[in-house]
Amino acid sequence: MPKRNDIKTILVIGSGPIIIGQAAEFDYAGTQACLALKEEGYRVILVNSNPATIMTDKEIADKVYIEPLTHDFIARIIRKEQPDALLPTLGGQTGLNMAIQLHESGVLQDNNVQLLGTELTSIQQAEDREMFRTLMNDLNVPVPESDIVNTVEQAFKFKEQVGYPLIVRPAFTMGGTGGGICHNDEELHEIVSNGLHYSPATQCLLEKSIAGFKEIEYEVMRDKNDNAIVVCNMENIDPVGIHTGDSIVVAPSQTLSDVEYQMLRDVSLKVIRALGIEGGCNVQLALDPHSFDYYIIEVNPRVSRSSALASKATGYPIAKLAAKIAVGLTLDEMLNPITGTSYAAFEPTLDYVISKIPRFPFDKFEKGERELGTQMKATGEVMAIGRTYEESLLKAIRSLEYGVHHLGLPNGESFDLDYIKERISHQDDERLFFIGEAIRRGTTLEEIHNMTQIDYFFLHKFQNIIDIEHQLKEHQGDLEYLKYAKDYGFSDKTIAHRFNMTEEEVYQLRMENDIKPVYKMVDTCAAEFESSTPYYYGTYETENESIVTDKEKILVLGSGPIRIGQGVEFDYATVHAVWAIQKAGYEAIIVNNNPETVSTDFSISDKLYFEPLTEEDVMNIINLEKPKGVVVQFGGQTAINLADKLAKHGVKILGTSLENLNRAEDRKEFEALLRKINVPQPQGKTATSPEEALANAAEIGYPVVVRPSYVLGGRAMEIVDNDKELENYMTQAVKASPEHPVLVDRYLTGKEIEVDAICDGETVIIPGIMEHIERAGVHSGDSIAVYPPQTLTEDELATLEDYTIKLAKGLNIIGLINIQFVIAHDGVYVLEVNPRSSRTVPFLSKITDIPMAQLAMRAIIGEKLTDMGYQEGVQPYAEGVFVKAPVFSFNKLKNVDITLGPEMKSTGEVMGKDTTLEKALFKGLTGSGVEVKDHGTVLMTVSDKDKEEVVKLAQRLNEVGYKILATSGTANKLAEYDIPAEVVGKIGGENDLLTRIQNGDVQIVINTMTKGKEVERDGFQIRRTTVENGIPCLTSLDTANALTNVIESMTFTMRQM
């Protein structure tokens, strides 16, 4: 069937900011889809609120709108652009929910917009739990015994029929938001009320728990002629009960018999046909390990996290083909882009095993609740490819960057067996490593199976890994065993530990004896057809399929899994760097291990190596490809941390030299540079022991900021006010030592400013200066950034420009540099310098139309900025006002304090742009999920040091008609100024504030941190309760102030004469 000619313009909805449950996989899907539609000749309009994506680049669609993804804003775009059709299935749950709202409100009908791809009735049938269950019953497909509830009372009725445990799944949410497993009445009450709150339809499905069944997924495609195929089937190692996004996944499935595989395949295709899905779809099934009984768990009628994984696992570009199916093309008339000879209707075949392991944020949130269930907690994931299951698992483990390199924890020997078994009996993110530890101690596989329900097949594989460890120990230095361990994915580091050698010695031993990996191609067809895709993985076999060319090559290191502090912004920079390398005539090679991103799409670079970002794995590639040099400044801290290790092997680091990278990080050298170029910084000292830190603080004066050197995203950084807090920090948060000193700095309160610049060694250009709304002390990634600055004087701007140029030249930067300044009462100080690409590069590139990462890469190759047409200094300002607002995923992370401070907590960002600051802020706040209302109730409970400041705020909110609730201390302060406030009780008292929050009486909470055990606990409970009830909680008065400005600009003030 030819494609549709009755439509010309298509609107694509993106997925918005990165949150837990909806990460970079949608940037990848959206980018592919927009390009595919343009390839077919359609005019594409994209709307997405996330500036950190490749998808929102001007080249990807014909028109790009970076606006909040709300019904109101998308409706405005539809009225303005008059598209013929809307494609909703590529923007995750956000895109689907928007399409449903636009349909229900009549916007699509009024503007004659058709929905492409899967029909709305099918989407609703898959998403609405009641309709889905009815359809499954009609098809005779078993679903777990369940009931749909709209109230907590109905939930208790169902519980009386079936008993515990029960699984709660809210309708129309993703990442399991609001869901969970209930074992008793208290949990049932809490989870169901939460779930009803988060479900747009106020509807939850309660089902009898089938935890312990195998969880199997099929990624399927169907077109309008009813051709349907399975692209990939995957098996979760963790049984049903853990969200698939938090499970360790293997593809293809390893433990299904052919009968089971075909049975579940038939069911998946039967369901997708009955639903009438056109495009990609994900089917999740539960299989009883002891019989042929199965249940269907759910169907996602859209491109998902699993489809990104399936695309990278097979090389089959699901999103691209789904977009083409949506405009009428069929599977039997589209060529598979990987082979170029076979059609898309051929099911991919794999001659390797892939492992996916989720990346959790608990290294950032040590107090977060680690227990895993049906609500997702991972921020990202890694994937690895191997020829054996063991090899792919071990490669995935060392891609995680947790400091674990193998099936065990670094301090594993110190745990006693009872503790290890206790940890295995709970489902959490470290269970896999504790299982390895238990097998090492001789625990039987039967005992582990009874505790975890993990299939024996996988337990035997774990056992094999431990057996090889013992063999290495018994045959130290034996080449036969070295080669054998390599076949099963062991790293040099692990072998060195068992051989009683250094990692370097093992590496040399391999080189001398020619024990090197070969690289195999990912070709979708297990070498059945000729294929020439430049997509490779390493393994220890005989035939190398990666043909090395004579062209000069540049290797770019990617940024690994998405985590807090290192998000999709770094992938954005990586992709732009690759494009610049290709334009300059070099061969561009990427090494990365994140299946969700655009950079690991094989069509981006000349060669993609899907490998762990470790010294060993990267060196193996360098030894084969012999590139001109390696670029580390676009891959975040992951890549920067590899620079000196690679340089030791004689690898050339392109761009800013290793010596200068270290000068920016090393405290003493950096201070010497600042003195030389005459740029002031807050007074600071270095401490290697608690005693030294206390002496430093006495000299500098409290408050001080303390942090370890060499970290990204402000890990383990704190502001402390007295000796006791400092002692506590030095003994508990960090273990300071001469190798790992702690920095103790004067904490300056003032405006925080962020600047990104590009330098070619001679000229420094500054695309933009951003002012933060939150004062210094809040991590730059969690602050609202404003461009152009709104409150700085000409003198301050001139000083910032001068200092930036001096720093870039003083450090001899080649490429990008990011600098944070604070403007205190007595002038401008530099807070920190990062000699690499930063979180704000995509944001500034979009605003100013200066392709920063590409210019930086051209400078690295040796081009001059003046030849590209740029003059030194701050570049002309773009018209309008732009804000970058942070987005948090606290509703998915229990026990995490949401107070903003020097440690980064946000998972994503949105951009708001308009003609005034207030309008831009309104869009930024709305896009980040803060509902801005022109009237309502605000609850204020602030620490003593903030009481004076909160008075002015309360006065202004009162004048625009907000009702004020306050705790007694805050209310007494307001009463002194005749500001009316209703007093609410402290926690546990009469009329207590938690109850008021839970009852929905409050629209905004303003709460600032008070130190001291009792109050800290209370404050923590207040903040958690607000998050769990979906209410904005502002922990910085600067944010509250900005919100008040926006509210004032929307309404009229009422003052008596």
UniProtKB/Swiss-Prot annotation:
Pfam families from the UniProt entry: CPSase_L_D2 (PF02786), CPSase_L_D3 (PF02787), MGS (PF02142)
Top EC class of this enzyme: ligase
Signal peptide: none
EC number of the protein: 6.3.4.16, 6.3.5.5
Domain ATP-grasp: 133-327, 671-861
Region (Carboxyphosphate synthetic domain): 1-401
Sites where the protein binds Mg(2+) 1: 284, 298
Cofactor: Mg(2+); Mn(2+)
Protein name (record): Carbamoyl phosphate synthase large chain
Source species of the chain: Staphylococcus aureus (strain NCTC 8325 / PS 47)
Upper lineage: Bacteria, Bacillati, Bacillota, Bacilli, Bacillales
